[in-house]
Amino acid sequence: MRRRIVTAAGLGLAFLLTSCGLLSPSDEAGPGPRHGRASSLPSARPVPVGQGSRAAGDFNGDGHPDLVLDSLLAPAGGHDDDPGIGIVYGSAHGLDPATRELLTPARNAAPTGETVPAAFDAETSCDLDRDGFTDLVVTTDPPYDGVGRPPVPVQLLFGSPRGLGPARAVTLRIPDRARIGNEWPDQPVCGDFDGDGAADLAVTTSGPRISYLRGPFTRGGAPRAAGAPVAVPGTALATTTPLSPPPDIDHDGADDLLVRSADPGRRARSRLALGGPQGPTRAGTAYPPGYAVAFGRFAAAGRGPAPLTAVTADTDGLLSVAGRPGTIRTGTGGAPTLAAADVTADGRTDLALGGTRPALLLGSPDGLSPTPHRLALPRLPGTGRPLATVIALTDFDGDHHADLVLLTRRGPTHDRVTVYPGGPSGLAARPTRSFTTADFAAAGLSAS
C-alpha cells in the first residue's frame, strides 16, 4: 500500500494544512512560530454553518468550495506520525484562512481495535450519501500481520453543516465478493461511473482489476451495491485534480475512470475505462506516457464547441495534446502536476502546470496556446530550486474565473501555499493569500 507525502491530483491532493493566513506575497516562509516568527495564520473563527449545496468540495454546505491540504510540515519537536489533514473553508470572497480545521488521526480517524492510525492521507472527495455536504475519502495504515487478506485502509469522513471537524471517520465496507487476492485496497477515486446521479467509488484490488462500489453510501460506510471485481486497462488509478469533475469523454452521462500502468508520481501510460450502466467496464482512449493527465476543451473549436480532450504532461512539462505526442514544450521542469479550468471566463479551458518553473497556458480559438505565462513563486529559505505543486484550479470566489492554488516547497522544512485569483487576462501576477503549512500544525486545535 503506497503512502503519499505530497499529492497533486488528487485529491488527490492533499497537503498537511496546518496554517492558513493572509500575508504579503513577499513575506518569507520562516521556520515557524516555534522559532520566534509570527504565525502566518489569522485568528481562527468558527466554520460557517451551511444548509447543504451542490458545489464540489463543499464540506460545510454553504455553497462555497473548500480546500484540502495534506502533507503538512510537522512542527518542530513533532513526532514522525502524520500531523493531519488541513481544511481551509471557502467564502463569498474566496478561501478564508481564518475558518480552518486540522483533522488528525487521534481525533478523526477510525481506530482498529485500540490502535489509532499513524498515517492519515486525503485521497478524493465527493458527496457519497447525497445529503448536500461533500465527504472526504482518506487512507490509513491499519495493523496487519501479513497473513491472509489485509484490512481495508480506506475511511470516509462525512461532511456536515459544521464541516468535517466534528466527524469521526468510518471504515469503507468492501464486500468480500468485490475483492480478489491479498493486495491492499488503495487509490480510491470518486465518480458517477454508472450515470445514475449518485457518487460511486473505484478502489484498486489485485492486478488489473478494481472494486467497483456503487453509491449512495450509508453513514456506516457501506455502498448501495458491489459485484465482482471489474477488469480495467491498467493496475493503478489516477484521480482528477481536486475540485475538478471526472471526465465524460463520450458524453453518455456516466463518468469515465482514468487508469495507469504505474502508481501516481511515476511516469506511465494511461487509458480510460469508460463508464456506463454497468460501471467503468469498457476500455477507452489510450494516452501517451507521462506523469499527469488533465481533461478539457483544448482542441481548436472549428464551427462548434471544442471536443473534450486530454493533455498529458511528461518530463519538463512536455505536453501531448489530444493524443499527439510532444505537442507543446513548456519548460516547467521536473515531473509536472496539472489542473484544467476556465481562468479567463471565455468558455475555453486553460491549463496550469506545476514544477520548478510553473506556468499557465491559455485556451484560444485555435486550441491551447503554446506560450507559457510564468508564475512568480514565493521566496523560501534554503538552497536548490523550489518545486511548486498544483493543489487546485477552481472558482473559489464566485466571479466565474478559476483561481489557482500552489504549494511551493524547498527542502523538507520550508513551504508556502499561495492563491492566485483568475481574471479576464489570466492569473494575477502576485498571490493574494500566502501561508506556510507548518503554522497550521503548530496551531493545533481549530475554532470549530
Please describe what each predicted stretch is.
Residues 2-448:
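Beta-propeller-forming repeat regions
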